[in-house]
Amino acid sequence: MASFGPAPLFTNHVDLGSILSGKLATEKSPTAVSAYPIATGSSVFGIKYDGGVLLGADTLVSYGKMARYPNVPRLFQVNDTTVITCSGDYADFQHITSLVERMQIEEERTQNEVVMQPRSLHRYLTRYLYNLRSKFDPKWTNIVVAGLQDGEPFLGYISMIGLAFTEDAVTTGLGGAIALPLMRKMLDQNKGKLLTFEEATKIMEESLKLGFALDCVAYPKYQIANINKDGVQMGKPETVSLNWKYVKNFDATL
């Protein structure tokens, strides 16, 4: 039915009041969540040794470049054989850990004595992150999965786009340039054999020291998880005792 009355004076105009009130943006733009990481964690480090795996990460979650939350554990124990950690957006990591918890509860409820293994979790998270990336809705976090698979140490990496691999030494973020060369050099010197627990602990502590010294969003307080045949030993937070002479000679160690 035709409407009667005076025609509007202007037809194709932008209502300034709607722009200022946000009404126009709400009507014409889709609802969106943050597409960039906000509260983030820095590099994490993992290395195999003969009989187990060590994972290390500091306890800081940064808001941009501000050290906002200094006492946040970034090592998550899935069960007695598996631990995961991350660098990147911490909220996305919390979502992933809650997803893993629900999976674990469901498996325990429906299947008797079935324990989630690190390799199967690594494969599941690879497909999960790749699927989200394919939908252009990635999780802004890089995951490291460590544990014991059939009595053998397992260490795997998954990027935010679903790129995955397993290795004897794994780092994320700036740790790939700072500590990974040091780890690989020590593994090469061992001629293909895994390190002892003492050697792995030493290289892990050195990696955390270098991370704190050379990464502007790293933190001196860190935590190390040890996964072996006795289960998961989650270490208490410790503080880096940094010797700047060690950092000065960093290039000579590579």
Residue ranges of model-derived segments:
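Long, low-complexity N-terminal extensions
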Residues: M1-L254
